[in-house]
């Protein structure tokens, strides 16, 4: 299972809303919400876009449990 710390990274690296992250990475706010709640696993491309936007390594946000 893949879990994430997206909400923590989103708030600490720019205090961005779900909608702001979604707009900047090219997906819906609902997608970001689903990722944060571990209901959806993002594609590698989307995960990389999120990490780049938040200036963190992908493995700092997404990890296997």
Model-derived regions, located:
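DNA major-groove recognition helix of helix-turn-helix
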Residues: 10, 36, 54
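Recognition helix of helix-turn-helix/homeodomain-like DNA-binding domains
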Residues: 27-41
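DNA major-groove recognition helix of helix-turn-helix/homeodomain DNA-binding modules
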Residues: 45-60
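Residues within helix-turn-helix
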Residues: 19, 30, 59
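Short basic helix-loop element that most often maps to the first helix and adjoining turn
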Residues: 5-24
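Short, Lys/Arg-enriched C-terminal cap helix and immediately downstream tail that follows
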Residues: 8, 44-45
């Amino acid at each position: 299972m893949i879990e994430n710390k997206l909400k923590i990274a989103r708030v600490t690296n720019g205090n961005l809303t779900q909608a702001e992250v979604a707009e900047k990475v090219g997906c819906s706010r609902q997608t970001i919400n689903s990722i944060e709640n571990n209901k959806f696993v993002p594609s590698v491309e989307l995960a990389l876009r999120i990490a780049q936007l938040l200036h963190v390594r992908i493995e700092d946000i997404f990890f296997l449990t």
